[in-house]
């Protein structure tokens, strides 16, 4: 298989089995752990593989490996600013820790459960494989919505204000512009950005997508990495209680803000040709 032959990164989950030749609950358990590890890597790095990721399940008996099942995943889309960043050892360690925490979180006795947080995480992982840049931007904005619980009719205003907990003050104009892209896609008005090719508009979309992805990913990673944050972000009632706290109380719980502009530190239009912008 070409994907396996060319692969230089393997995420492995294994356990001892009394029935290694049977695809049963043990197989499902190691598959889930491998998947959690992979999701952890998505949160730890903006990596994009050269081939579609593959999940192989099987057994090892008498020194021989027997592959019993193969699943192909949709491939994460390369970024425009840094298409193929290296996956470094710190990324792997972070991915493993996040993967372990995801397994713990799935069975944690949280009041109100954890559906909302896992749904938000699902939206993020799906967005990483979405081809069109405005659709990715839309989905990453939805991830942020999932973590701030905006009220109906006040979504744009609260998208600007409530994200201060993640990125600090001073970014209201930026967040408003991001929300405008989200709203355009939601109401099928993305022709404003895509119908005719304008290089400056497309470059601006590149920056916006990179920024909103960075906010969504780093916020999710911090929440999953810190079990003290789980009771505040796992579900809708928890978020309502969190929003009812004072700003200083919320800041104390969250910690230092994320710098959203880190995502575009390497942005240089001279290295971005029109073909990368969809022309």
Regions from the PLM with identified roles:
Residues 124-127, 131, 144-151, 166, ...:
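Generic structural signal for hydrophobic core residues of well-folded globular domains
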Residues 169-198:
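Histidine-centered, metal-coordinating catalytic motifs and their short helical/loop contexts
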Residues 192-247:
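C-terminal structured domain segments
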């Amino acid at each position: 298989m070409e994907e396996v032959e060319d692969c230089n990164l393997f995420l492995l989950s294994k356990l001892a089995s009394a029935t290694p030749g049977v695809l049963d609950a043990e197989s499902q358990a190691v598959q889930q752990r491998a998947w959690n590890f992979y999701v952890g890597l998505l949160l730890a790095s903006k990596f994009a593989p050269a081939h579609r990721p593959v999940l192989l399940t099987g057994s090892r008996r008498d020194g021989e490996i027997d592959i019993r099942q193969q699943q192909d995943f949709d491939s994460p889309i390369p970024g425009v600013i840094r298409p193929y960043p290296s996956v470094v050892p710190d990324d792997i360690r972070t991915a493993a820790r996040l993967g372990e925490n995801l397994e713990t979180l799935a069975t944690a006795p949280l009041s109100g459960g954890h559906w909302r947080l896992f749904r938000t995480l699902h939206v993020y992982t799906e967005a990483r494989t979405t081809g069109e840049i405005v659709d990715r931007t839309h989905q990453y904005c939805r991830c942020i919505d999932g973590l701030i619980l905006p009220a109906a009719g006040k979504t744009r205003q609260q998208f600007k204000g409530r994200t201060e907990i993640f990125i600090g003050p001073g970014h209201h104009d930026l967040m408003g512009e991001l929300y405008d892209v989200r709203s355009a896609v939601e109401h099928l008005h993305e022709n404003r950005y895509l119908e005719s090719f304008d290089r400056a508009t497309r470059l601006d979309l590149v920056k916006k997508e990179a920024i909103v992805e960075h906010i969504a990913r780093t916020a999710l990673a911090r929440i999953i990495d810190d079990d003290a944050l789980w009771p505040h972000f796992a579900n809708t009632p928890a978020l309502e209680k969190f929003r009812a706290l004072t700003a200083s109380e919320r800041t104390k719980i969250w910690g230092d803000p994320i710098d959203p502009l880190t995502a575009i530190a390497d942005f240089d239009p001279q290295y971005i040709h029109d073909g990368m912008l969809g022309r």
